[in-house]
Regions:
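Amphipathic protein-protein interaction modules
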Residues: 92, 96-152
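Short hydrophobic targeting helices and cationic amphipathic motifs
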Residues: 12-13
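Polar/charged low-complexity regulatory segments
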Residues: 28-68, 128-177
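Amphipathic alpha-helical packing elements
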Residues: 68-109
Length: 177
């Protein structure tokens, strides 16, 4: 007996979702998001307790697929988590190229990270990254204020880099700030 999901999947096959093999459904490549159509996951999303990691994995997979749009793998935000974990971006990209899922990548990171952390350390770091705002130097504060102003003239609640990234993602895909 087929489950409801299997029946639904079978009833909604189209030529673009079926394999060249007769009767075999083709699975969409959900591992490589199209970041020209939607943003990567939130910087607040967690994988293994790590903030930023799911977002960076989305950008890495999209980069490999050529669907990264305006998003850049190994940008300064990504470099924060790469530094904390102690993983070289090229090696992570090579693992993503193998088609590994999030869980497999997390296992690889845990096995290969130069910097091993206790769960409480990872949680504190991730909480800090969620709350991290611009540094107090005038140049950074000005950049932050101008960047937020380009996105919205009315949003006074945008205080952290995570806030800015989420707002930018929202506005970039048609949202009203």
């Amino acid at each position: 007996m087929k489950t409801n999901i299997e029946a639904t999947r079978e009833n909604h096959q189209t030529p673009s979702t079926t394999s060249k093999r007769a009767g075999a459904p083709r699975v969409a490549n959900l591992g490589a998001p199209d970041l020209t159509q939607r943003p990567p996951r939130s910087p607040r999303s967690r994988l293994g307790g790590y903030a930023l990691l799911p977002r960076m994995l989305d950008k890495g997979r999209a980069t490999l697929a050529g669907t990264n749009g305006e998003y850049h793998f190994n940008c300064p935000v990504d470099q924060h988590i790469l530094s904390f974990i102690g993983i070289e971006p090229e090696k992570l990209l090579a693992e993503l190229k193998k088609g590994k899922g999030d869980g497999e990548i997390l296992e690889w990171i845990q096995a290969n990270a130069k910097h091993k952390h206790e769960p409480w350390e990872t949680q504190q770091w991730s909480d800090y990254m969620d709350r991290r705002g611009p540094d107090s130097d005038a140049e950074t504060l000005q950049f932050f204020a101008e960047y937020v102003a380009k996105l919205s003239k009315t949003r006074e609640d945008i205080k952290t880099w995570a806030d800015v990234l989420e707002l930018d993602d929202f506005v970039s895909f048609g949202g009203k700030a």
